[in-house]
């Protein structure tokens, strides 16, 4: 409707509402004086209420006797027994088995991918999938041997000793 009204005003069919208002020359554009909040509070509370304020010295803020001091100790960290680290070793034969790798990794389980039984083209695709998976879930991927990779979730740290055992074949005999 505003468009129609503006068109009618332009064509001179109706009177413009803005022309009805007169300009006032004595209008002051300056901002009105604001009183300070403290002044307003003092004026409002002036006769009704008075408060007594006393400044506290540094001597008064600390206890006079060291025996009055109470020692607060931090609670000792409780060590939760960590469950034994479960590592899944998978020997995929086709790229279609990538889903199983992703599901185990998403659950927070380190995955060893043994790609020795795959052809090179599918192995490359699976390594690309694993790299994207570890990047997306903030994990890490490491090459153990030429066609064997370790995928570690972000909250799992595999020690150098474990990696050495994997390279020697200690984990590959589990499946």
Swiss-Prot record:
Magnesium as UniProt keyword: no
Keyword check for Cell division, yes or no. yes
Taken from the UniProt record, the cysteine pairs bridged by disulfide bonds within this chain are none
The source's superkingdom equals: Bacteria
Q: Where is the composition biased (Acidic residues)?
A: 20-29
Cellular localisation: Cytoplasm
Gene Ontology annotations of biological process type: division septum assembly; FtsZ-dependent cytokinesis
Q: Which residue stretches does the UniProt record annotate as biased composition, category Basic and acidic residues? A: 30-47, 54-73
Q: Which keywords fit this entry according to its UniProt record? A: Cell cycle, Cell division, Cytoplasm, Septation
Give the span(s) annotated as Disordered: 20-88
GO CC entries: cytoplasm
Family stated for the protein in its record: Belongs to the SepF family.
Q: What does this protein do?
A: Cell division protein that is part of the divisome complex and is recruited early to the Z-ring. Probably stimulates Z-ring formation, perhaps through the cross-linking of FtsZ protofilaments. Its function overlaps with FtsA.
By its UniProt entry, which PANTHER family does this protein fall under? CELL DIVISION PROTEIN SEPF
Q: How does it assemble?
A: Homodimer. Interacts with FtsZ.
Protein's name in the database: Cell division protein SepF
């Amino acid at each position: 409707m505003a468009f129609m009204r503006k068109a009618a005003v332009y064509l001179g069919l109706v009177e413009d509402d803005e022309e009805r208002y007169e300009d006032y020359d004595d209008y002051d554009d300056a901002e009105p004086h604001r009183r300070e909040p403290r002044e307003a509070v003092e004026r409002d509370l002036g006769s009704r209420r008075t408060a007594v304020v006393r400044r506290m010295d540094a001597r008064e803020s600390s206890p006079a006797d060291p025996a009055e001091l109470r020692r607060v100790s931090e609670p000792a960290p409780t060590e939760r027994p960590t469950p034994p680290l479960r590592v899944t070793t998978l020997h995929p034969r086709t790229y279609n088995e990538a889903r199983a790798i992703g599901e185990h990794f998403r659950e927070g389980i380190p995955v060893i991918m043994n790609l020795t039984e795959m052809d090179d083209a599918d192995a490359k695709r699976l390594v690309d999938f694993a790299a994207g998976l570890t990047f997306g879930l903030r994990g890490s991927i490491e090459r153990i041997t030429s066609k064997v990779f370790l995928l570690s979730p972000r909250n799992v740290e595999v020690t150098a000793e474990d990696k050495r055992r994997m390279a020697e074949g200690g984990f590959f005999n589990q499946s």
